Amino acid sequence: MATLTGLTFGGQVWTPQFVEAVNQDKCIGCGRCFKACGRNVLILQALNENGEFVEDEEGEEIERKVMSIIHPEYCIGCQACARACPKNCYTHSPLEHN
């Protein structure tokens, strides 16, 4: 398999690491990763006390909020989300082609 690579402005080989998962058990819902990502990959979602996703409206019982991946196809592999995350919630991997 071939791995997608690129070059930095300085000419060094760079392998983008694309977002795979967010550990929602570790996520504190601070939103730092959301602010760091300019590609609309992430969304902050509300969880009820049973750990189920619910609408973020006044009538719903919200236990906490966590980050979720809504558009993984928009990820450019920069890992800005992981660098901004204080709880190390992100898993990334290179893109491999057959």
Curated annotation (Swiss-Prot):
Annotated keywords: 4Fe-4S, Electron transport, Iron, Iron-sulfur, Metal-binding, Nitrogen fixation, Repeat, Transport
Domain 4Fe-4S ferredoxin-type: 18-47, 66-95
BP terms from Gene Ontology: nitrogen fixation
Keyword Signal among UniProt keywords: no
InterPro entries hit by this protein: 4Fe4S_Fe-S-bd, 4Fe4S_Fe_S_CS, FdIII_4_nif, Fe-S_Ferredoxin
Pfam family, one: Fer4_7
Cofactor requirements of the protein: [4Fe-4S] cluster
Function: Ferredoxins are iron-sulfur proteins that transfer electrons in a wide variety of metabolic reactions.
Residues that hold [4Fe-4S] cluster 1 according to the record: 27, 30, 33, 37
Gene designation per UniProt: fdxB
The protein's name: Ferredoxin-3
Domain of life: Bacteria
SUPFAM superfamilies reported for this sequence: 4Fe-4S ferredoxins
Keyword DNA-binding: no
UniProt: [4Fe-4S] cluster 2 binding residues: 75, 78, 81, 85
